């Protein structure tokens, strides 16, 4: 003969039912994340290197970038000269907007060797400190001062950032030409 469920058994059965329903709702919400951009954070100098290494996988063969050369080279000594050459070997062309600083001018002078086209903008007005690279369906941000790397993977966001870059490029080219006039 089966025994009657005890009050504690009923309580535990009820709790299991409630928790299983909550778990099912949480699992459903996780499934919906697929429609959202994937965002990855990387900390420290290693994290910054990680996001730059990811840019070397650009399938489109193109990167557009806004960056401060001074901050890049100060944050990670001896990394970028080799990175530039690996990007070139991988056939990934870069168009970049640099602040008009001594290092920006130096890097612009190395455009051909580093498989890049760059323009300079007045650093007092348009100087930035992080690097922002856009490639494929990714937006990469490297904050050298905060020691943080971020990759946002979203076709929609990357497309918008590429269009914003194109608009900035037109203005930056005009500023670059103006600074080179006698």
For each predicted feature, which ranges?
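PLD-like (HKD) phosphodiesterase/transphosphatidyltransferase domain
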Residues: 2-91
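PLD/PLD-like phosphodiesterase catalytic module centered on the HKD motif
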Residues: 78-182
